[in-house]
Each structure stands twice: as C-alpha cells, then as structure tokens.
C-alpha cells in the first residue's frame, strides 16, 4: 500500500519508482522454471507462496497499474546505455519469452546485444515503448517478437488486424530511423495455462504466415523460431518448456543458431 500511496500524480520529472529488487524466492523460481529435465513441482509451487515472492508480485502488479506500457521497466538501464556512448548492435524486443531469454541464454547478451522484453505484454504495449526501448538506443538491428499475449487477450479482446497494425507501426518507426528489422515468428503453443479455454495453434500459424509474407514484401529478415521449437501438430517440443509456452534453457539453446543471425 505504501508503494501506491507514494506513486507520483500527474506529469512529473521522474514518474518511475526505484528499481524493484528481485528477492531470492523469485530468482529461484525463475532458475527452476528454465531448468531442463524434471522439475520439482511441489517446491516450485511452494516458492509462489513465500511471503517475499507474494510481496514482490503485489508490488509489481501495483506498478503495472500505473505504468500500462512498462516505460519504467528499462528507463534507467536505457539512460545508462545512452550515457555510456555505447551503441548496441542489436535489441531483442518482446514479451516474457524475450525477457526470460537473458536468463535462459545469458551468453547471447551483453553490451552489444541487449534484451528489452516485458512479461505479459501485447504488441500495443510494445508499440508505446518502442521509441524509448529501441529507437533511442540507436541499435543497428531490432528483433521484434510479439503475439503470444495478443492471441491470449492479456489486455482485453483484440483482433488480428490490430496486431498487424502494431507490428507495421513498429517496423515503420524502425525503418524511419535506419534500424534493420528482424521479425521473429510467434513460438508454438498448444494451450495457454492462464487461458485454458483458448486453442492458440491455428491463430499462431495464421499470424506467422502473415509475418513471413509481410517480411518478404518489406525486405525484412524473418526468423522462424516456431519451426525449431514446434512438433508437427504445433505444440512446443517435449522437454523444451515447462508450461508449453516459454522455452527453457534447452529451448533457448535450440533457438541460438537463428538468434545469432540478429546482427
């Protein structure tokens, strides 16, 4: 409650609270979630009931309520990057799959390749932060990976046209600033554990076909991670994900060869 009460009101010089420290139970949960092989599910679930884990999620949710686009998530990191004078070669831009990539394959990232993923975000939210988290950093190339949460309707009902418009807007912004664009396919999923009533496979296939065709028309690079991760029926390959949506370390390792083309 103290966090909400301390939230600035109106237009201010610095609307962002101090960075949110990640407590040990959350770090342990993330490590277990990304670990290949059999996972100790009782222990994993017990971590989500740890008071520090619960408090962290509550604080994170409170911040998201006043920062819909997640502009505060990387603001200080961006300021530090710009102040250093180092221009990153590539920005990996996306949702939780991109956010977890930094943990799942840390050797891929560093000063030259940086991650700007935020869990749960739709393409509409990503579009709002595209200038701050991509354009202002002046990278040579940006990889855009979005769509899972649009299909899930994480921020309410939407349409394929809305998704396509958001992708096209980000591409046009990048081109206007001479940033090369890589469009990544939406990874496979037979179901979403947070929206079990949905059958996402057909929409994933349809949107990936559109992404591929749009990339070809616009002279962009299209990276098909779906083909690497998917079974013939469109599910995530067994052993490469705990929840069937987010890759684990083995899943990210399988994506590495394609990811290294983002240069």
Regions found by a protein language model. Give the residues of each.
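Extracytoplasmic/secreted proteins, especially bacterial periplasmic and envelope-associated proteins
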Residues: 92, 121, 125, 129, ...
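Charged, glycine-enriched surface loops/patches
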Residues: 160-184, 210-220
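A generic secondary-structure signal
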Residues: 132-136, 169-173, 258, 262
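Oxyanion-hole/transition-state-stabilizing segment in secreted/luminal serine hydrolases
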Residues: 92-93, 98-116, 124-165, 187-191
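N-terminal secretory targeting modules
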Residues: 1-91, 103, 107-108, 137
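Catalytic His-Asp segment of secreted/periplasmic serine-dependent ester chemistry enzymes
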Residues: 187-263
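Loop/turn elements at helix/coil->beta-strand transitions in domains of secreted/extracellular proteins
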Residues: 87-89, 111-112, 137-142, 175-182, ...
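Second-shell loop/turn segments in exported
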Residues: 115-120, 155-160, 171, 197-200, ...
């Amino acid at each position: 409650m103290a966090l909400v009460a301390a939230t600035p009101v109106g237009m201010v010089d610095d609307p962002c609270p101090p960075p949110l420290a990640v407590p040990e139970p959350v770090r342990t949960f993330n490590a277990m979630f990304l670990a290949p092989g059999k996972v100790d599910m009782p222990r994993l679930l017990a971590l989500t009931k740890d008071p520090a884990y619960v408090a962290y999620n509550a604080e994170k949710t409170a911040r998201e309520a006043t920062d819909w686009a997640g502009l505060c998530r990387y603001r200080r990191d961006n300021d530090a990057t710009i102040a250093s004078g180092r221009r990153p070669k590539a920005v990996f831009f996306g949702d939780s799959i991109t956010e977890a990539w930094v943990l799942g394959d840390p050797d891929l990232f560093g000063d030259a390749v940086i991650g700007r993923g935020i869990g749960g975000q739709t393409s509409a939210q990503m579009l709002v932060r595209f200038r701050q988290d991509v354009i202002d950093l002046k990278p040579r190339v940006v990889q855009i990976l979005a769509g899972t949460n649009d299909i899930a309707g994480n921020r309410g009902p939407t349409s394929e046209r809305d998704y396509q418009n958001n992708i096209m807007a980000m591409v046009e912004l990048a081109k206007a600033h001479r940033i090369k664009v890589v469009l990544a396919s939406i990874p496979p999923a037979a179901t979403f554990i947070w929206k079990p009533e949905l059958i996402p496979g057909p929409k994933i296939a349809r949107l990936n076909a559109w992404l591929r065709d749009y990339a070809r028309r616009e002279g962009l690079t299209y990276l098909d991670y779906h083909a690497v991760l998917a079974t013939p029926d469109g599910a995530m390959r067994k052993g490469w994900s705990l929840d069937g949506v987010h890759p684990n370390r083995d899943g990210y390792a399988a994506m590495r060869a394609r990811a290294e083309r983002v240069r």
